[in-house]
Amino acid sequence: MISVGELVEKLSPHAGAIGGVFAALLLGLFLAFQRKEDRKVLDPVEWRSFKLVSKDHLSHNTALYRFALPRPNDSLGLPIGQHISVAAEIDGKQIVRSYTPTTLDNDKGHFDLVVKTYEKGNISRYLSLLTIGQEVRIKGPKGKFVYTPNMSPALLMIAGGTGITPMYQIIKSSLQTPGDATKLSLIYANVEEDDILLRKELESLRDSSNSRFTLYYVLNKPPSSWNGGVGFVTKDMIENHMPAKDVGDERVLMCGPPPMISAMKGHLAQLGYPAPRTVSKLEDQVFLF
């Protein structure tokens, strides 16, 4: 395809003949056509490679990885609430793990992954060792949950550790969408204060939400000056910091370590919520990522 520079070069010698206004009009039409060519680059079957362009350490064991898309106007093409598969060949075997980007499709030209590195985590360690310019292979979208504006009057979200990523994506999308009135509440549990991921971003969303989004942190090992929740997430915390259960068709979304999720199932059962399925479906009132 001809570039903008090539088009200008071709038009320049003839500008006097066809008129500067006409040349400008052609250039404007060309640029408009280019903008319409915004592409969604994900493929559910074919693995595609994307280059690492930056790495920002959020904590001692967690980083935000930014990968470039092929063109500045490209978007990933990921429905809100879904995730991607990341693959790598490790010790002669292809290893695949799922991650939810923290970027939305209106973030053009790149996508971001927030990943915690585990000592025995194959893909997380692989990502941590990537250098700028190296590539990863991904495909997608994957997942059963797709967020749409006003799909429920309230979303009650409980997250632990890196389980924050699908919640953050949903919260960010909801608050940026005109006409979406969904009430959003998040209980976010971690071990220590330094483990709280995307804290600045979450608090910025809360502060600009006109009280539509509430945020409550819980720490297992809090500092002496801590004013949030202490220990593990309890039934009382859910009752006190989630929207009132009488709002109607509210939904509960959960993502976190298995022991935490097991405990949350018990709390929710006591509060009258149905038991989640092993593999959650979009229509479920309690959805596990």
Q: Which residues does each PLM region occupy?
A:
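Structural motif
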Residues: A154-L156, R251
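Reductase modules of NAD(P)H-dependent flavoproteins
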Residues: M1-G28, S185-F289
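Cytosolic-side junction of a single-pass transmembrane alpha-helix
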Residues: L26-K40
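Ferredoxin-reductase
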Residues: E37-Q134, N190-E192, E203, N220-K221
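A short, basic/flexible loop-to-alpha-helix module at the beginning of a structural domain
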Residues: G140-M151
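Short, conserved phosphate/pyrophosphate- and ester-handling motifs at nucleotide-, phospho-/glycolipid
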Residues: G81, G163, P257
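Conserved S-adenosyl-L-methionine
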Residues: S152, L175-L184
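Histidine-anchored nucleotide/phosphate-binding helix
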Residues: I164-P178
